[in-house]
Swiss-Prot record:
Organism lineage string: Bacteria, Bacillati, Bacillota, Bacilli, Lactobacillales
Gene Ontology CC, one term: cytosolic large ribosomal subunit
Identification of the protein by name: Large ribosomal subunit protein uL3
Region described as Disordered: spans on this chain: 117-147
Binding partners and assembly: Part of the 50S ribosomal subunit. Forms a cluster with proteins L14 and L19.
Entry-linked InterPro entries: Ribosomal_uL3 (IPR000597), Ribosomal_uL3_bac/org-type (IPR019927), Ribosomal_uL3_CS (IPR019926), Transl_B-barrel_sf (IPR009000)
Amino acid sequence: MTKGILGKKVGMTQIFTESGEFIPVTVIEATPNVVLQVKTVETDGYEAIQVGFDDKREVLSNKPAKGHVAKANTAPKRFIREFKNIEGLEVGAEITVDIFAAGDVVDVTGTSKGKGFQGVIKRHGQSRGPMAHGSRYHRRPGSMGPVAPNRVFKNKHLAGRMGGNRVTIQNLEIVQVIPEKNVILIKGNVPGAKKSLITIKSAVKAAK
């Protein structure tokens, strides 16, 4: 069965194992998520649970949003997402970090840091041209393709806006879970800036 929770990225640190191994970890704070709705095939056409995370002031919510969360007897939520293939939860139930344990393999989704308008070298990793005095080609995008089509093909690597995309990193290991602090430590780095929304789910390609 799939397990999932929403959290916020706190930052990175490092821990040492009992054997002295150094492990860089990302700290994710995941306060209890609340099940706001249970979707079924009969009513919605598919099965899923809708989860809310991070309370916000009622003055910032409209009447439909307040009525929606009232069914779960909770405060309005800043982030609402869905998880599929999760069973046994009812409206109003809480999902806490202790659904995961050290050693679990998960997929982590976040929004990558926005870098603004960047050239092809930074954005796509292209090599620059010669920097010699006689060269007139340094950081340009290169050939636009053959003459015959009379156009530039789609997906040509060009300068443009970089970052700010939804990114999923698969098969990351959970190093430690601290239930009393609502914290999960994940090995390595995860996409996103500090305080950004992070989705943690059971890995779909984990070795069985």
